[in-house]
Amino acid sequence: MSLALDLPRLETTLRLPAQDELQNLLQGLLQPTARIDSKYFYDDRGCALFTNICRLDEYYPTRTEAQIFSDHREAISAQLPDAPQWVDLGCGDCSKTQQWLNAVQPARVIGVDIAGEFLHSSMAAVARENPDIECVGVVCDFTQQLELEHVLAERPGHPPVFFY
C-alpha cells in the first residue's frame, strides 16, 4: 500500500499567540515608513501571486536557479544519500522539488511553508504524481525556530536532505 494515496499529513508548528501577531503588525505600521512583514501576505492568494511573479521574464532568479540545477543535477544527486527525506524549505508550489524526485528518489518529501492551505494543495499534487513517495507538509514560520526533529525521527535510516 502506498503511503501517498491518502492526502498528505500536515504538521503545524506555526504561529505566535494572536496578541504577539497583532503587536508585530502594529509595530510595523507605526514605523516612520509603515511596513508589514511579508509573511502576512502568504495566504492562498499571496502564494499564487508569488508563483506567477516567479514565471515573469523580469524575475530571473527562478530561471537561473533552474538552469544551474538542470546542468548539475546528476552530479549533485550522486553526492546525496540513498532514499533520503527530502526537506523542501519554503516549498511553495513544490515545482522545484518535482524536478529532483527522479534523480534523488527520496523515501519521503517533507514540504515546509508558512501557508497551510497552499502547502496542503501543493503536497497533494506531489503525492498524486508520485504515489510511491510519502508526503508530509509542515506549516511553520521561518522567523521562529524550525521544529522538524519529531517528523524526521519517524523515518530513521533515511537522512534528511535540506533543499531551499
Give the positions of each predicted feature:
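Conserved SAM-binding loop of SAM-dependent methyltransferases across substrates and taxa
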Residues: D93-Q105
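Class I SAM-dependent methyltransferase Rossmann-like catalytic core
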Residues: A34-L80
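Conserved SAM-binding strand-loop segment of SAM-dependent methyltransferases
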Residues: P131-Q144
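N-terminal auxiliary segments of SAM/dcSAM-dependent transferases
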Residues: S2-Y40, C47
